Amino acid sequence: MAFTPVGAALLFFGARGPRRQILVPLALLAASDVILTTMVYRYPFSWDHFVTWAWYAGMLWLGTSLKQNAGALRILGSALAGSVSFFLLSNFAVWAAWDMYPRTAGGLLTCYGAGVPFFRHAVAGDLLFTAAMFATPVVVHAVSEWRQKSGDHIAA
């Protein structure tokens, strides 16, 4: 099950985060990947992690393209592009890095087929979390403006 906010958070940070701190989430995610993989799950570290980290960087970069033009369709299209690219890249990396599937076209297709159930959850999570993250500041701003216009203030 891959229902996570990671892609959405990277898009949002790329779009709304300070430019000088753009590498902070990438560094934190990479460090947590290494710690979880080697110390918690006790799996060997493999080059396929670099594929995931490249995807993280790509999502941050894609988010920066939303700084100037963050319309709803562009945001959701970016989230969907993130889901598809992660599915393609991560499954290719698993096929290439590990001996789980034969190194043939059939083995690659089998690997992609095994990833489809995760992909459905990833798309749902990416779209839901992206919509929530990008909508929240808009809604908060609209409510704040409405309250100011109506004279409704919360006592501090």
What is each model feature region?
Residues 146-156:
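Short, charged juxtamembrane terminal tails flanking transmembrane helices
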Residues 1-4, 28-62:
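Interfacial aromatic-anchored transmembrane helix boundaries in multi-pass membrane proteins
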Residues 71-146:
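Membrane-embedded alpha-helical hairpins and interfacial helices in multi-pass inner-membrane proteins
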Residues 13-19, 58-69, 135-144:
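Structural signal for the C-terminal ends of transmembrane alpha-helices
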Residues 52-83:
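Internal catalytic-core helix/loop-beta-alpha segment
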Residues 22-27, 49-54, 76-80, 123-124, ...:
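Hydrophobic alpha-helical transmembrane segments
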Residues 1-16, 20-23:
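Hydrophobic transmembrane alpha-helices
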